[in-house]
Structure formats: structure tokens, C-alpha cells
Amino acid sequence: MPRVKGGTVTRRRRKKILKLAKGYFGSKHRLYKVANQQVMKSLMYAYRDRRQRKRDFRKLWITRINAAARMNGLSYSRLMHGLKLAGIEVNRKMLADLAVNDAAAFTQLANIAKENLNK
């Protein structure tokens, strides 16, 4: 009985890695060994940055809210505290969207926060 060396399995595995490495520069998309290393690293970056993206967006929203709050005479922390005292539960994503796209509505929320801080 002839010996089976698993050539089709190996070829399939290598083709899968080279397919994932499509678009990489130079030997990183041509040579299996280099491509495999780069694909593993790329998957690690992707895993890490899916979590980092959530933090980055939260930072962006807070920066936008803070800028709009200061235009209304409040700091970010005082605005958020005032809204909490007023019982207004609006998340940072929506607040940042209001700050950018609907300044009048954001100003109303800032005024409500000011009133509740002064009580």
C-alpha cells in the first residue's frame, strides 16, 4: 500500500493562510512562512483593536461633549452630574451626537443640568 503524505491537507492549509495574506506587501503575501507570521500578528492586532475601538469612541464622545459643555459654561463632569441629578438618562453617544448636530437641544440639556446643580 502506498504511503500517504497529506499533500492536499497541507496545500489547503497553506492556501488558506496565503488567501488571508492577500494585499500584504512583498513577501508577506507570497511566502508561506512569512505570510503565516504576518497573518497571526494581524489577527492579534484585530482582536486587540476591536476592544480598543470601543474605548476610542468613548474618548471621542467625551471630548465632544466637554467642548460643547464648555461653550455653555459647564465642564463635562458638572454637566454629567447635573443631568444625573435631573434624572435624565442619555448616553454619551447620543449627547455627543446632539452636541455636533443639534446645538439647540444640547443647550437645553445644559441649562437643565445647570438648574439642577444650583438646587
Swiss-Prot record:
The organism is Anoxybacillus flavithermus (strain DSM 21510 / WK1)
> So what family is this one in?
Belongs to the bacterial ribosomal protein bL20 family.
Output the SUPFAM superfamilies linked to this UniProt entry.
Ribosomal protein L20 (SSF74731)
Task: Kindly give the Gene3D superfamilies that the UniProt entry links to this protein.
Answer: 6.10.160.10, Ribosomal protein L20
* Pfam families the record matches: Ribosomal_L20
Going by the UniProt record, its keywords in alphabetical order are:
Ribonucleoprotein, Ribosomal protein, RNA-binding, rRNA-binding
Q: What is this protein called?
A: Large ribosomal subunit protein bL20
**InterPro entries linked to this entry:** Ribosomal_bL20, RIBOSOMAL_L20_CS, Ribosomal_protein_bL20_C
